[in-house]
Amino acid sequence: MDLSKWPLINWLAFLATIVINYFASGENAAVSDRIDIYFKPAGYAFSIWGVIYIALAVWLVLQLKKGSVANRQANRMKAGFLVSCILNGLWLLTFTNEWFIASLVVMVAFLATLAWLYYIAFRTSTSWLDRFPFSIYIGWVSVATIVNVFVVMNRERVTTLLGLDELAWTSLMLMVGVVLALVFMWWHRDFIYPLVFVWAYIAIFARIDNATLYVVLVSALILLTLGYVGLIIWKKPRAFLHHSRKTVE
């Protein structure tokens, strides 16, 4: 068992994050409910945090085994995981206090930190399982970052931007999300990341009441599904289970 600095710090940071999220979840939901934007998944979609935290907990257990893939990942991440936990809690602080511009700044930093953690996880192992916690984590925070942008626009009363209103920007960003998900899938041989977007888009569809967005969402989901299946057929399923990129021992 590896009880060195980073594995232990990671556990402490994770437990603190769970506690903070538990006590802040009610206020976070209340603030979110008061903000009426198109690009927002239905409440049930946020249950994905349970999957994320369970996956991270499993990874944290595995990182305690000296020499394991998770252990090598943790030691290469150094303070990265700790920083992600701090930013997670800091985002809750800014959002629940309705400091929305600050919350967006924190969210972007959070996403950048997760991108770094994902890169290390990707370079340490070829198996999709060894990066699953970070695939689903960065996927959901990618969606949350887009949501956060629309929250800021709403609270700052930005009704149009570059000549486009909220409906037009929502339609555009739904399609941008499709491209992002498929490019990420292709580049990293990651079949988990785009599934998070499918989950989010279905949840957005479940709560909206706008004919235009119905059409855009259905189109986005069809394109995402076709692209997803097409990439798997093109690259072969095995390429997504074990990528061929060079890893660091």
Q: Model-derived features: where do they sit?
A:
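Alpha-helical transmembrane segments and their membrane-interface exit regions
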Residues: 108-119, 201-203, 223-231
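Membrane-interface capping segments at transmembrane-helix boundaries
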Residues: 65-66, 120-123, 230-246
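Membrane-interface helix caps and helix-loop-helix hairpins in membrane proteins
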Residues: 91-104, 122-128, 156-163, 183-187, ...
